[in-house]
Design a protein with these regions (language model features):
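Acidic glycine-/aspartate-rich tracts in secreted/extracellular proteins
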Residues: 330-331
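Short acidic-aromatic active-site loops that bind/stabilize oxyanions
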Residues: 4-8, 188, 248-252
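Alpha-helical packing segments of well-folded alpha/beta enzyme cores
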Residues: 11-22, 68, 72, 194-201, ...
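Catalytic cores of secreted or luminal carbohydrate-active enzymes
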Residues: 237, 241-271
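Conserved alpha/beta catalytic core and glycan-binding cleft of carbohydrate-active enzymes
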Residues: 27-29, 44-229, 235, 267-278, ...
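Substrate-binding/active-site clefts of carbohydrate-active enzymes
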Residues: 1-61
């Protein structure tokens, strides 16, 4: 794709006036900057492995583009101090979400782009019982201090034409025949369970924000495809079918009920305000991951056949006495087995 020449004053004036226009005329209070990686590197970050700081700060860095982004975030917050600026940057540029006065670029949040890529890779490559839980923990918890990250399971990169949503990868063709509430099969039951667990563990280990994407909160089955020459300019897939979740006879409503309860849980226990996640137990053979955060114990069983009854878990210094189950993905109201 073509990029702007950020070294020209006329270009900078045009882009900044565009931001101001949307804020003042339409009262926009949030901006997501797409393709930031392509902007800030002269090679657009293509084929680059960002494994060291020399990859971030070199002659390949487009200083003029970085300066424009600093001006843009400064302007956004000058017009509305409560406005939010989010960067989509797959390179992990240091300082992206630090204030400009500290040498940063000034964004409020960055998207945790490695997380959805991790989930798709795991789903495509191996059975859930053999997922690498150590890698899962690393992907969901590794972030720079003082930089706010938005956790999410999937976005347009997964849901657009040419790829599949998480639920479609899990259930495949049975999405079209097996979503009646009265129907059960190993494929559908496993897909429903994993879809809930993937969302919950991603939210639980997010520290700054959590993002739902256009229907993944109820497991929308199909991709998004905007009208174009290749599809005869059809609007057929340029939609999200909320009627699926509103229909009380389908499992989509159970997935949505889970999402609603999960978000209420996150608000009640201030999950996004806690930064003290501690890995308590990883058992690769049993496919069990357990951790503490904010005084709560989270236990996830990713094994597709072992229900891990009478499982003993060392909780260390989190607390003493008895523990109560305050939230479970296996409730019947959520499509579980109780």
């Amino acid at each position: 794709s073509r990029v702007f020449n950020y070294g020209k004053h006329e270009v900078i004036h045009f882009l900044l006036s565009n931001i101001k226009y949307w804020q003042e005329e339409f009262h926009f209070d949030g901006f997501r900057f797409d393709g930031v990686t392509s902007m800030i590197y002269r090679n657009h970050g293509l084929g680059e492995n960002f494994t060291g700081y020399d990859k971030y700060f070199s002659l390949n860095t487009d200083v003029e583009a970085v300066t424009y982004l600093q001006l843009a975030t400064e302007l956004i917050h000058a017009i509305n101090p409560f406005a939010v600026a989010i960067a989509e940057d797959m390179s992990g540029m240091p300082g992206m979400c630090l204030p400009i006065r500290y040498g940063g670029i000034g964004f409020d949040y960055r998207l945790g782009m490695g997380v959805p890529d991790f989930w798709i890779r795991m789903i495509k490559s191996t059975n859930c019982s053999h997922w690498n839980l150590y890698e899962m923990w690393h992907e969901l918890t590794t972030r720079r201090p003082q930089e706010k990250v938005i956790g999410y399971c999937e976005s347009h990169d997964q849901a657009l034409v040419g790829d599949k949503t998480i639920i479609f990868r899990l259930a495949d063709s049975e999405m079209y025949t097996g979503m009646d509430r009265a129907y059960h099969s190993p494929v559908i039951d496993r897909a429903i369970a994993l879809h809930k667990m993937i969302r919950f563990v991603t939210l639980a280990l997010a520290c700054d924000g959590y993002l739902n994407f256009m229907g993944n909160e109820f497991g929308h089955p199909e991709w998004i495809d905007f009208p174009r020459e290749g599809n005869g300019y059809s609007f057929h897939y340029a939609r999200r079918q909320w009627s699926l979740a509103d229909n009380g006879y389908l499992k989509y409503s159970q997935l949505l009920a889970f999402d609603t309860a999960m978000l209420k849980f996150a608000r009640k226990y201030r999950v996004m305000c806690k930064r003290d996640a501690e890995n308590l137990w990883i058992d690769p053979n049993a496919a069990v991951l357990a951790f503490s955060k904010g005084g709560l114990i989270y236990v996830f069983n990713f094994h597709d056949t072992n229900d891990a009854r009478d499982f003993t878990l060392p909780v260390h210094t989190v607390g003493s006495g008895t523990y109560d189950v305050i939230f479970t993905s296996d409730e019947r109201a959520f499509g579980g087995f109780g």
